[in-house]
Amino acid sequence: MAGVLKNVTDDTFEADVLKSEKPVLVDFWAEWCGPCRQIAPSLEAITEHGGQIEIVKLNIDQNPATAAKYGVMSIPTLNVYQGGEVVKTIVGAKPKAALLRPGPVPR
């Protein structure tokens, strides 16, 4: 059974993501985005084996301020935040293996 991803909003982003003690992967997505739906099962599967990183979702249509603040121009965009800063960005639908790979991912 896949894990459930927590939804964050413009109002909860700072507390849930920027002030988190562990790294947080934020999935910037939208309902109408086919590739976003394509990667959702991979992200949910990763949460089952997690513990080292938290994975959350932010709907850009409902929460445009945070997406704009971090320059999200296309979706899906996955940003990893650590200590309040973006430490890794993945743009586009990537296979699960690429999502698990440490270090920067080519765009």
Curated annotation (Swiss-Prot):
Coiled coil: none
GO cellular component: cytosol
Phylogenetic classification of the source organism: Bacteria, Bacillati, Actinomycetota, Actinomycetes, Kitasatosporales
Matches recorded under Gene3D superfamilies: Glutaredoxin
CDD domains tied to this protein: TRX_family (cd02947)
Originating gene: trxA
UniProt cross-references to Pfam families, sorted A to Z: Thioredoxin (PF00085)
Protein's UniProt name: Thioredoxin
Alphabetized PROSITE patterns for the sequence: THIOREDOXIN_1, THIOREDOXIN_2
Family: Belongs to the thioredoxin family.
GO molecular function: protein-disulfide reductase activity
Domain Thioredoxin: 2-107
